Amino acid sequence: MALKTGDVLELHRRWCIADSHADSLMWNRDLCERSSEGHVDFPRLREVGMKLQCFTIVTRGFPFIGGFEAFAVWRGWPKEARESEWTRAVWQVDQLAEFCRRSEGQVRITTTGRALEENLAQGRLSAVLGIEGAHAIEGQVERVAELHQRGVRFMGLTHLSNNEAGGSSFPLMGNRPLSPLGHSVLEEMARVGMGVDVAHASERTLEDILAHPTARVFSSHTGVRGAGGGWRNLSDEVLRRIAERGGVVGIILAPVYLGGDAIDDVVRHIEHALGVMGEEGVGIGSDYDGMVALPKGIHDVTDLPKLTEALLRRHPEALVERILGGNFRRYFRETLGE
C-alpha cells in the first residue's frame, strides 16, 4: 500500500498517535519552541499528529562513570534543582507543568482516563509523566504518593544501575531482586494507581514485579529478544505475561536494541511482539531524546510517518492504528482511571 506523506499525516490526525517514552525534560530545552536540537518539542509533536506523549524523568546517569551532575550543569539546570535525585525529579515535573501552562491549552499533563479522552475530543496533546528509577524518592516510600499528587502516573523501579529498590538490567549489575524497600514501593504504587514500567528491570526484579497481583505492568521502551538485538530486550515469556495482565510493550527506536539501524528492523521487532502478545499488546516507545541513535531516515519525531508507511505496506490500517497509539490509549485509559 503506497501512501504519500500527506496521506499518512491525515491518518495521524485521525488516530490517537501515542509514544510511551521520551527523555526530553532532562535536556532543559524550551518545549514550547520548535528546536533544531533533539527529537521532541510541542510544535513537532503537534505537527506529526501526536496525541499522547509520555515524558520520562531521569535523575541518575550511567553506572561506573556517573556524570549526571556534570550533564545538568552543562544543560543549564539551576543549582537548587541539581542538589539531589529528589530535587531533580521535582524540578522536571515543574518544568513540564510550566511548559503546559505556556502552551495555552494545547498540551496538558494528563492524570485520568477521562481527561485523556476529553483531550482527544478537543484536539489537545496529552502529556503523561513517568519516572526512570525509584532512587528518585531517596528511600522515602511516602514520596510515591507525593509524586502521584504532582501528576506522575508511572515509574520504573530501576534505571541504568541498581538502587535501594532493586536490580537493573544494565550489564554487570548482578541480576538483583526487589529489596524489601522495593516491595514496599511497589505496593504503594499499586495503592495510589501508578503504572509499573519494567523496561530497565533485572530479570529477578522483573519476576518479583510480575508476581504482584495488581501491579499495572508495562514496558515503556524495549526491544524483544526473539527478534535479536540488545542486552535488556524482553523474552517471549515476559511478553506473554505482560499481555495477560493487559499491559503493553513500547517498541524502542534505538538500533542498539533492534540489532540493525533500518526502519524495517523496528518493524521486525513489532511483528515478533505481535506474534507473541497479540494485537492489543504492542505500541511505540521511541526513547526520543534518550541519548540514543535512531534508525536511518528518522531524525526526530516528525519522521514517524516513515514508520507508519512501512507498517501499512504489511498490515491493515486497523492494526497499524492500534500499534501507533490505540493500544497505549487503552492501557492508560484503564490505568489512569477516572
Map each language-model feature to its residues.
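Alpha-helical elements of the RecA-like P-loop NTPase motor core of helicases
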Residues: M26, R204-E207
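Short, hydrophobic/aromatic alpha-helical segments in well-folded domains
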Residues: R143, L181-V185, T205, H269
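Alpha-helix-loop-beta-strand connector modules within alpha/beta enzyme cores
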Residues: N175-V192, I209-V217, A310
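Catalytic beta/alpha-barrel core
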Residues: M194-A201
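Acidic, glycine-rich loop-and-beta core segments that form the ion-binding/anion-interacting portion
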Residues: E203, A211-V224, G230, L234-S235, ...
